[in-house]
Each structure stands twice: as C-alpha cells, then as structure tokens.
C-alpha cells in the first residue's frame, strides 16, 4: 500500500495554493512505497487547465514513481490528458483539488484507477 509523509502532502497543498488559479505539477519520489519528496522540474509550464513538464530536465532517477498536480476547479478526477500521462509516467499519481486541504486529494494507479494513499 502506498503512503505519503504528511509534510510532503502539506508542501504539495501549499505549492498548489501558491500556483492558484494555475495548475501546479511535480513528480513524486518514493522509497519502499513511501512518498517522501517532490521533484519540481525546471521549465515546467503551468496553465489554467494544464501543466506541461519539460522531461529533458528529469534525468535518470529511479526514486521517481509518479506525478502530482492540482486541479483548481476543485474536482480531483483525471481528465483524458491525465489518463494518458498516468499510463506513461509512473506507478502512482496524485491529483489535489481546490481549496487544497489535507483531505482534498485522490490517488490513482497507472490505469487511472483510484487507490488508497495512507498519510504518515
């Protein structure tokens, strides 16, 4: 079962608030299915309905297990673009939604199926 450190989730929520009304996006780093950090890539473009990652800056990092991004709309469900990205970029993906409280998130696997994410 996947878990996330509370401080990491708080950081994601604060970054999402700071980016509002634009989307925030980053990659997730984990060890033994515990997400402990985010990786923000230089050149990431934040828009009102999208986040574009410059993957040339990602490098090879085997601790990167998936992605996180915000939905300023308040709906933490994947769009068609999210579903496509999930299948290509990792094992776990998190969508956080406005107003960005600790409970305003949903986790998904690479098939866009909801999965449990325990907060540590």
At which residue positions do the language-model features occur?
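Cys-dependent condensing catalytic cores that perform Claisen condensation/acyl-transfer
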Residues: 67
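Conserved beta-strand-loop surface patch within small alpha/beta domains used
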Residues: 1-64, 73-120
